[in-house]
Amino acid sequence: TKATEGEFLAEGGGVR
């Protein structure tokens, strides 16, 4: 999942 630095951990991955 493409997430921001804040959502990165919340999404459990993605792109910082």
UniProtKB/Swiss-Prot annotation:
Cleaved by the protease thrombin to yield monomers which, together with fibrinogen beta (FGB) and fibrinogen gamma (FGG), polymerize to form an insoluble fibrin matrix. Fibrin has a major function in hemostasis as one of the primary components of blood clots. In addition, functions during the early stages of wound repair to stabilize the lesion and guide cell migration during re-epithelialization. Was originally thought to be essential for platelet aggregation, based on in vitro studies using anticoagulated blood. It comes from Tapirus terrestris. Coiled coil: none annotated. GO terms for biological process: adaptive immune response; blood coagulation; innate immune response. This is Fibrinogen alpha chain. Heterohexamer; disulfide linked. Contains 2 sets of 3 non-identical chains (alpha, beta and gamma). The 2 heterotrimers are in head to head conformation with the N-termini in a small central domain. It is found in: Secreted. Conversion of fibrinogen to fibrin is triggered by thrombin, which cleaves fibrinopeptides A and B from alpha and beta chains, and thus exposes the N-terminal polymerization sites responsible for the formation of the soft clot. The soft clot is converted into the hard clot by factor XIIIA which catalyzes the epsilon-(gamma-glutamyl)lysine cross-linking between gamma chains (stronger) and between alpha chains (weaker) of different monomers.
